[in-house]
């Protein structure tokens, strides 16, 4: 299927220029290590998260919560890809490994590890290079996040009326994503 991501950004932290427009893209030659992130969030511990990245040996290109969040997820994505590669490299060629890694990535594990230290409100979506997509909401439910699903589409948005209007569905068919999911 297709994955479409849209985001209306209003700047609360970082710049209000074209370089701050979502989605943010993290590119890599390995398809499974590519990452796109967009969302409504404000990390209150961005300095701490940024410092964690520096301690991992990374050098993020910007000091914004969006880049910090993306690189934090990217670190654990890379870690998971490497783990799967190391487990299987003796048994498969690299082309086969690429497909196996894409099908066996543990997205929940990646996001749980990456978001462990996130503090603040967030509702975000993202996609990995091989096509798997995700949504993520802060554990305290500070930022809203809703979803609708039928036989043809799965959609998530931070505003219920956006889903209701676009897909012509009644209020009761649009569900709130539980905090921490």
Where are these regions (language model features)?
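Conserved short alpha-helical segments that host acidic/polar catalytic motifs at enzyme active sites
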Residues: 1-179
